[in-house]
Design a protein with these regions (language model features):
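Active-site histidine-anchored catalytic micro-motif
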Residues: 2-189
Length: 189
């Protein structure tokens, strides 16, 4: 029996970091050593980039888009993009517009995969199960649930992503720095 192939692309971020008193870069694909895929599934890893998403700039996004456009999607059941959570929704929205009909799921984590209570493995499993289901709902985000990439808001102070109630409506700039809104944000281990 031929195995179903899923391409997993590492870009860095917390999902590819190591736990400790601070979160530091480690290996973009180390989660593949911790995750057991379903029977009949072969995860093919490519460490394309290694940076925290908060350091993404225009040049990086151009490189990422070029890389993602160069993938032969027909060779895989789907593609998982491991990404940092800080700019996850921005990159996801960009890729949703660039690759609207591709089987692509962006996956992030609140803490490194080996940290106690990390959502890294469950988020990866959600992405794999979604791709195996054959659903064709466009680019998705797997982070404590499945979210449409084009209509997901930035994480709130408790690291939860939400669906935008009215996507693509311009909003007024905040007058606050946001600090008052995020007093309850937990510190990362």
């Amino acid at each position: 029996m031929t195995k179903q192939k899923i391409l997993v692309i590492g870009t860095g971020g917390t999902i590819g970091a190591k736990a400790g008193s601070t979160i530091t870069a480690d290996a973009p694909l180390k989660i593949l050593n911790l995750y057991t895929p379903p029977a009949g599934v072969d995860l093919i890893g490519q460490a394309a980039f290694d940076r925290f998403s908060e350091h993404a700039d225009l040049a990086y996004l151009e490189q990422l888009c070029t890389y993602m456009q160069g993938i032969d999607y027909s060779a895989y059941r789907g593609v998982v993009l491991l990404h940092g959570s800080d700019t996850l929704t921005y990159t996801a929205a960009l890729l949703a517009h660039l690759l609207p009909d591709k089987p692509l799921v962006l996956v992030a984590a609140g803490t490194p995969p080996e940290a106690p209570g990390s959502n890294a493995l469950s988020n990866l499993d959600l992405a794999v199960q979604y791709l195996l289901s054959g659903a064709k709902d466009g680019v998705q985000i797997a982070y404590d649930g499945l979210h449409p990439a084009w209509a997901t808001t930035e994480a709130d102070c408790n690291d939860r992503f939400h669906h935008a109630s009215v996507p693509f409506v311009p909003v007024q700039p905040r007058r606050s720095t946001g600090a008052a809104f995020c007093k309850s944000r937990p510190t990362r281990a």
